[in-house]
Amino acid sequence: MKIINSFKKTFLFTFCLLFFSAHTHSITLEKTPVSLNNPWGMSWADDQLLITQKSGEIFLVNTNDYTKIKIDHKIPFVQHGQGGLLDIVSDKNIVWVTGSIKKNGKYTTAIYRAELKNNILINEKLIY
């Protein structure tokens, strides 16, 4: 019985080595000419990236020519300690942004939903 169990383990191990071998991938890093200070989160929007900076700015960066446009918003994020403007997620023209806000004298994390129109976040709404 021990011989059969040992054989099964050896067979399974050999099978895994043969059919699930590791493949190497080549990765090339490219330094871009976009200047950012403390970038934190990013989200793809077609051929562009929405990038947040911890200090509160949001930029739309074209990934073809690396032009950068500042997105105007009125979301009251505050940079304090490790907090600030954090992650961003987009789906078409809808954007969700997380970050630190001050509420009742204390710092907490909040999520806002907004629409991106003409490089401005509009209809900003606190959802959490």
Could you describe each region identified by the protein language model?
Residues 25-128:
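Acidic, Gly/Ser/Thr-rich repeat motifs that build Ca2+-stabilized beta-propeller blades
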Residues 12-13, 117:
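General helical structural elements
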Residues 2-12:
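Bacterial N-terminal signal peptides that target proteins for export
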Residues 19-21:
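N-terminal signal peptide c-region/cleavage motif recognized by signal peptidases
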